[in-house]
Amino acid sequence: QDFEKERLKELNNKPAFFNDHERLTLIALGDLIIPKDEVSGSASDAKVIDFIDFIVKDIPEHQVPLRGGLKWLDLQCLNRYGKSFTASAANQQLEILEEIAYPTKVKPEMHQGAVFFSRLRNLVATGFYTSQIGIKDIGYVGNVPGRWEGVPADVLKQYNLTQVKYGV
């Protein structure tokens, strides 16, 4: 559709929504959500940050919750560790994420972080599993036509067609 092509061109011509610090934080979070393993690459290998940046330009309703969530996360780390999320040690990053990653176990004072993390986790998973790396990771091959083996023998027998010759 022409409208879709124009919209895609418009979105791709917009500057990046996230600043450098936000991008680095999102990349770090993405790799904690989907790390590289022996089967596939990480969220950053799949360029999930570019997907998320595209989505927030296409669906502006994500902008405030994501930017606000990133600020919330940095403030939590600054208050606890005196550093931003990306400057915090790996165990400190995981400590914060453990408190917001499981919605049914979240303390009331961490609710805002849990809402942010849930949205981000969904975007990271969507970005990853719609990338070439993610598609390969799940073994998706797309629509493949079935192989025609001819009319099954039981159907031929049912209609008394077992003596009929097919082909040339």
Predicted region positions:
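N-terminal export signals
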Residues: 1-2, 89
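Immediate post-signal-peptide N-terminus of mature secreted/exported proteins
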Residues: 2-46
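Mature-region segments of soluble proteins
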Residues: 9-11, 23-28, 47-168
